[in-house]
């Protein structure tokens, strides 16, 4: 399953979650908040350039070297290995904090 298929499935699951949230809470605002949070969550996981972030975190603010692979080679490689995500401790702490806070705020809004 490539990135496109994963994105499609994520968006369909998000649409189902938005419909369920809207029906259960009878609130268009809460359904829209669910949609917004879901889009940001999906974008945060599926869209980043993992080749850029797979470097040491101290190198994130410097440009990538010019000797990168061609776009065709990178696309072919991504099709075979969708999850190039390496669980570095700093990255995991950052993502857990951001997504945890976002999920908490979303839940407090939807459950109110």
UniProtKB/Swiss-Prot annotation:
<keyword id="KW-0256">Endoplasmic reticulum</keyword>
<dbReference type="GO" id="GO:0005787">
    <property type="term" value="C:signal peptidase complex"/>
</dbReference>
<dbReference type="InterPro" id="IPR006311">
    <property type="entry name" value="TAT_signal"/>
</dbReference>
<feature type="transmembrane region" description="Helical">
    <location>
        <begin position="33"/>
        <end position="53"/>
    </location>
</feature>
<dbReference type="GO" id="GO:0005789">
    <property type="term" value="C:endoplasmic reticulum membrane"/>
</dbReference>
<keyword id="KW-1133">Transmembrane helix</keyword>
<dbReference type="InterPro" id="IPR039955">
    <property type="entry name" value="DTM1"/>
</dbReference>
<dbReference type="GO" id="GO:0009555">
    <property type="term" value="P:pollen development"/>
</dbReference>
<protein>
    <recommendedName>
        <fullName>Signal peptidase complex-like protein DTM1</fullName>
    </recommendedName>
</protein>
<dbReference type="Pfam" id="PF06645">
    <property type="entry name" value="SPC12"/>
</dbReference>
<dbReference type="GO" id="GO:0006465">
    <property type="term" value="P:signal peptide processing"/>
</dbReference>
<keyword id="KW-0812">Transmembrane</keyword>
<keyword id="KW-0732">Signal</keyword>
<dbReference type="GO" id="GO:0048658">
    <property type="term" value="P:anther wall tapetum development"/>
</dbReference>
<keyword id="KW-0472">Membrane</keyword>
<feature type="signal peptide">
    <location>
        <begin position="1"/>
        <end position="25"/>
    </location>
</feature>
<feature type="transmembrane region" description="Helical">
    <location>
        <begin position="92"/>
        <end position="112"/>
    </location>
</feature>
<dbReference type="InterPro" id="IPR009542">
    <property type="entry name" value="Spc1/SPCS1"/>
</dbReference>
<comment type="function">
    <text>Functions in tapetum development during early meiosis. May play a role in the endoplasmic reticulum (ER) membrane in the early stages of tapetum development in anthers. Seems to function after MSP1 and before UDT1.</text>
</comment>
<comment type="similarity">
    <text>Belongs to the SPCS1 family.</text>
</comment>
